[in-house]
């Protein structure tokens, strides 16, 4: 079995990605009026980092970024949601493996694939796993946490669907397309 090393580029991406995740999570959110539930731009950025650098980078960026954001905002981390940020980053990374953004192409078919995957991933993470962990870890009332989870899932689907798709398209457009250079 071949040992896979983590590249310096991936470690740097995790560090920078986590820092940007914290900044977006602290300062670029839109309150919804429902407790501890916001429209988050950080998950669209997490989708970009995960799609470019893979599932491990997405996992670590989500875990580290969310934990630091919680510690700097509330004084402690809400671990059930920190774990889910890592899971969603990993899932975005798996979705991104098929996108091949470095080829310079992000077609309509790729957009549909990405958005179908992120919808399923957000529902699983935020509407199912996060509330269940809230109940198991913190003994929170089920009706409250499942309501928060569904609202968060819907808001993240919208945020990642719009902002994340724009970021992925912009990144792919910045890459040199294979076969685009010609000898004169």
Swiss-Prot record:
It holds the Pfam family ECF-ribofla_trS. One of its GO terms (cellular component) is plasma membrane. Belongs to the UPF0397 family. The chain crosses the membrane at residues 11-31, 44-64, 77-97, 117-137, 148-168. The lineage of its organism: Bacteria, Bacillati, Bacillota, Bacilli, Bacillales. This is UPF0397 protein SAR2767. It is found in: Cell membrane. The keyword NADP does not apply. PANTHER family: UPF0397 PROTEIN BC_2624-RELATED (PTHR37815), UPF0397 PROTEIN SPR0429 (PTHR37815:SF3). Keywords: Cell membrane, Membrane, Transmembrane, Transmembrane helix. It comes from Staphylococcus aureus (strain MRSA252). It is a multi-pass membrane protein. It comes from the Bacteria.
């Amino acid at each position: 079995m071949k040992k896979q090393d983590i590249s310096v580029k991936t470690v740097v991406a995790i560090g920078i990605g986590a820092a940007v995740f914290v900044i977006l999570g602290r300062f670029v959110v839109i309150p919804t009026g429902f407790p501890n539930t916001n429209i988050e731009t950080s998950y669209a950025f997490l989708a970009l980092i995960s799609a470019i650098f893979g599932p491990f980078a997405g996992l670590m960026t989500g875990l580290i970024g969310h934990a630091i954001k919680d510690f700097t905002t509330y004084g402690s981390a809400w671990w059930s949601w920190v774990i889910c940020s890592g899971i969603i980053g990993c899932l975005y990374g798996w979705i991104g493996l098929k996108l091949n953004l470095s080829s310079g192409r992000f077609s309509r078919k790729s957009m549909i694939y990405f958005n179908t995957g992120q919808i399923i991933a957000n529902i699983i993470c935020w509407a199912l796993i996060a509330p269940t962990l809230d109940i198991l870890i913190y003994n929170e009332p089920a009706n409250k946490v499942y309501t928060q989870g569904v609202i968060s899932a819907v808001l993240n689907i919208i945020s990642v669907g719009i902002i994340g798709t724009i970021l992925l398209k912009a990144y792919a457009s910045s890459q040199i397309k294979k076969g685009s250079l010609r000898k004169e």
